[in-house]
């Protein structure tokens, strides 16, 4: 696929594009990221401008993409690179993992894509290929270390960055979670799941904490009161309606409109309190 962060640019710009795109792709699908990446890099074209950008402008460029701590960490990373690495993106996994918001996967993705190192990052797409090729079905027993040990199956290439992305593309576009396109797959002849005609991989059951909130909607002539959020870790420093966390029992006593919002680490149940008016 043509993706905006894959277009031919200078080496330094490629490093910046890789850094920004990998932050945006954390917990977000490619098709969602594309327009945000284009807008972000148009307005913030390099590490220097990112390190100096006003926080409000930064959040405006990120607005709607979610997981706003990524934007804050991305700016912190840019500041650290400019200050400690003379504006050059570090080119070792250990150094990259010292930067805010960069963990094992992101550091490996940057090494492969930006620096052409012989590394295959283990994302969900690569995991799915390995589980199907080796017919791994005991989800709770499959560790990251075990899956990493199986990556030798893919071999190596002199174009390591392109090769790593190609493998991830096979997972995204061919070895799909449902209805995989096995007849188009370049590795189906080595795939045990294909031979068994059994492609299902059960997802882990994930149970989030449930938290309860009351959102207070103050309005006057269709003008609404918003406040800067310094209270909650989610949507930090963004404008929200005044909101309090409440006990389950109190939430259940409320009568009126409610919202259910699913986040990565919790399920939010929000009561919309429209009774409040701004008094002149």
Task: Go through each PLM region and give its residues.
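Catalytic cores of DNA base-excision repair glycosylases
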Residues: 1-181, 187-192, 196, 210, ...
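Intrinsically disordered, low-complexity, charged terminal extensions of DNA damage-control enzymes
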Residues: 1-2, 7, 169-280
């Amino acid at each position: 696929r043509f993706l905006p962060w894959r277009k031919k640019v200078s080496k330094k710009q490629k490093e910046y594009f890789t850094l920004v795109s990998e932050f945006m792709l954390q917990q977000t699908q490619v098709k969602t990221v594309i327009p945000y990446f284009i807008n972000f890099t148009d307005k913030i074209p390099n590490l220097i401008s990112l390190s100096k950008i006003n926080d409000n402008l930064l959040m405006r460029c990120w607005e709607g993409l979610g997981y706003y701590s990524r934007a804050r960490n991305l700016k912190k990373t840019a500041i650290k690179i400019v200050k400690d690495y003379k504006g050059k993106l570090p080119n070792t996994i250990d150094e990259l993992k010292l930067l805010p918001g960069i963990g094992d996967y992101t550091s490996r993705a940057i090494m492969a894509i930006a620096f052409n190192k012989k590394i295959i990052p283990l994302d969900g797409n690569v995991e799915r290929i390995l589980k199907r090729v080796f017919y791994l079905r005991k989800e709770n027993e499959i560790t990251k270390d075990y899956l990493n040990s199986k990556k030798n199956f893919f071999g190596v290439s002199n174009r390591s960055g392109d090769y790593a992305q190609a493998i991830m593309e096979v997972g995204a576009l061919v070895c799909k979670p449902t209805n995989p396109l096995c007849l188009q797959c370049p590795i189906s002849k080595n795939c045990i799941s294909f031979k068994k005609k059994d492609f299902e991989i059960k997802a882990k059951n994930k149970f989030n904490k449930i938290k309860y909130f009351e959102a207070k909607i103050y309005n006057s002539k269709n003008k609404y009161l918003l406040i800067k959020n310094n209270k909650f870790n989610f949507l930090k420093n963004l404008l929200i309606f005044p909101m309090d966390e409440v006990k389950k029992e109190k939430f259940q006593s409320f009568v009126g409109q409610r919202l259910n919002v699913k986040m990565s680490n919790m399920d939010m149940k929000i009561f919309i309190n429209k009774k409040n008016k701004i008094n002149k």
